């Protein structure tokens, strides 16, 4: 099987930074899953004795805590600080940016519209910085059902698709007196998405490598399917199915921002033997 890799794929700056922080802070607790890749989390737990804790009330005062890349709600961060916990913040700088924008814009009286998945930890963290009621919408259709104020500030989950953000921005501009638009989709996400789109036009089959709970990985799969119907998401090489590759000659591979090189290489090696 011939293989072609996407021009841009895999670990982004924020994930690399977070993993380095975890490796340097052995025996620490991580507030929530550091990244959305179970295989890499297992490696960190095994080799560096870091453990995940979802409840801030269960974190002892004398324990070192790493804040996940997606960030955490403002009230949880303040709780840990008041508790006297030693905090190492691995929140991606690209996530901190929308947190700051939401806080400042809501203080200025703007209604916050956040384009993202309301159940995603990044979105939960970002929206907690709003000082007034904010809207979280995952599509233009959801926005069309909401009541908008005159002054609106639009931000996005960092892993969303730019064309959808532009549709939402256009809708707001047509209906609100004043609209502040902030493109908070991170550069790595945009590059990886464009590379996946370009590659999907050339290949017979696309394999997207990454965690099934990863937002940016699921976005890559959605993009790949636009031009390559036979696109599949796998967490590792063991999830590959031979039947997918029947009568296929050229396989494209891309990977989510939280997918380590060692997993990508294992997938690539197995496909090369088909």
UniProtKB/Swiss-Prot annotation:
Its EC number is 1.17.7.4. The active site is at residue 122. (2E)-4-hydroxy-3-methylbut-2-enyl diphosphate binds at residues 36, 70, 120, 158, 214-216, 258. One of its GO terms (molecular function) is metal ion binding. It comes from the Bacteria. The keyword Iron-sulfur applies. Gene3D superfamilies: 3.40.50.11270, 4-hydroxy-3-methylbut-2-enyl diphosphate reductase, catalytic domain. Binds 1 [4Fe-4S] cluster per subunit. Its cofactor is [4Fe-4S] cluster. Keywords: 4Fe-4S, Iron, Iron-sulfur, Isoprene biosynthesis, Metal-binding, Oxidoreductase. Pfam families: LYTB. Isopentenyl diphosphate binds at residues 36, 70, 120, 214-216, 258. It is an enzyme of class 1 (oxidoreductase). It catalyses: isopentenyl diphosphate + 2 oxidized [2Fe-2S]-[ferredoxin] + H2O = (2E)-4-hydroxy-3-methylbut-2-enyl diphosphate + 2 reduced [2Fe-2S]-[ferredoxin] + 2 H(+); dimethylallyl diphosphate + 2 oxidized [2Fe-2S]-[ferredoxin] + H2O = (2E)-4-hydroxy-3-methylbut-2-enyl diphosphate + 2 reduced [2Fe-2S]-[ferredoxin] + 2 H(+). Pathway: Isoprenoid biosynthesis; dimethylallyl diphosphate biosynthesis; dimethylallyl diphosphate from (2E)-4-hydroxy-3-methylbutenyl diphosphate: step 1/1; Isoprenoid biosynthesis; isopentenyl diphosphate biosynthesis via DXP pathway; isopentenyl diphosphate from 1-deoxy-D-xylulose 5-phosphate: step 6/6. GO terms for biological process: dimethylallyl diphosphate biosynthetic process; isopentenyl diphosphate biosynthetic process, methylerythritol 4-phosphate pathway; terpenoid biosynthetic process. [4Fe-4S] cluster binds at residues 12, 92, 186. Dimethylallyl diphosphate binds at residues 36, 70, 120, 214-216, 258. HAMAP family: IspH (MF_00191). Belongs to the IspH family. This is 4-hydroxy-3-methylbut-2-enyl diphosphate reductase. It comes from Helicobacter pylori (strain Shi470).
């Amino acid at each position: 099987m011939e293989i072609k890799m996407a021009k841009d794929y895999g670990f982004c700056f924020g994930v690399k930074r977070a993993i380095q922080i975890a490796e340097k802070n052995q025996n620490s607790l991580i507030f929530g899953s550091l990244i959305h890749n179970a295989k890499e989390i297992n490696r960190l737990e095994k080799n560096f004795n870091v453990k995940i804790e979802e409840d801030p009330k269960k974190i002892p005062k004398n324990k070192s805590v790493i804040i996940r890349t997606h960030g955490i709600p403002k009230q949880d961060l303040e709780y840990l600080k008041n508790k006297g916990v030693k905090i190492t913040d691995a929140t991606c700088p690209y996530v901190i940016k929308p947190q700051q924008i939401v806080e400042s814009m809501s203080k200025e009286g703007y209604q916050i519209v956040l384009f993202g998945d309301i159940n995603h930890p990044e979105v939960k963290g970002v929206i907690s910085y709003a000082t007034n009621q904010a809207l979280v919408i995952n599509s233009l259709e959801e926005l069309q059902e909401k009541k908008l104020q005159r002054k609106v500030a639009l931000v996005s989950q960092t892993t969303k698709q730019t064309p959808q953000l532009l549709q939402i921005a256009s809708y707001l501009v047509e209906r609100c007196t004043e609209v502040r638009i902030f493109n908070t989709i991170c550069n790595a996400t945009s590059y990886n998405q464009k590379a996946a789109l370009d590659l999907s036009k050339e290949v017979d089959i696309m394999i997207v490598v990454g965690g099934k709970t990863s937002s940016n990985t699921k976005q890559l799969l959605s993009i790949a399917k636009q031009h390559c119907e036979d696109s599949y998401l796998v967490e590792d090489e063991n999830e590959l199915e031979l039947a997918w590759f029947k009568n296929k000659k050229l396989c494209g591979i891309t990977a989510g921002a939280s997918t380590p090189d060692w997993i990508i290489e294992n997938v690539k090696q197995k496909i090369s033997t088909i």
